[in-house]
Amino acid sequence: AVLSPEQSEELHKYVIDGARAFLGIALVAHFLAFSATPWLH
């Protein structure tokens, strides 16, 4: 499927937002796991 510039831009925005959300959740999860495990300190 060939996307128009507008469509590919919109798709790219969703991909970037999804990646940001995923990274944010992963960072929070790792931080919580790190603070919840005393043997890492």
Swiss-Prot record:
It comes from the Bacteria. Residues 37-41 are periplasmic. Pfam families: LHC (PF00556). The keyword Cell inner membrane applies. InterPro entries: Antenna_a/b, Antenna_beta_CS, Antenna_beta_dom_sf, LHB-1/5, Light-harvesting_complex. PROSITE patterns: ANTENNA_COMP_BETA. Its main location: membrane. Residues 1-13 are cytoplasmic. The chain crosses the membrane at residues 14-36. GO terms for biological process: photosynthesis, light reaction. It is a single-pass type II membrane protein. This is Light-harvesting protein B-800/820 beta-2 chain. Antenna complexes are light-harvesting systems, which transfer the excitation energy to the reaction centers. Keywords: Antenna complex, Bacteriochlorophyll, Cell inner membrane, Cell membrane, Chlorophyll, Chromophore, Light-harvesting polypeptide, Magnesium, Membrane, Metal-binding, Transmembrane, Transmembrane helix. Belongs to the antenna complex beta subunit family. The core complex is formed by different alpha and beta chains, binding bacteriochlorophyll molecules, and arranged most probably in tetrameric structures disposed around the reaction center. The non-pigmented gamma chains may constitute additional components.
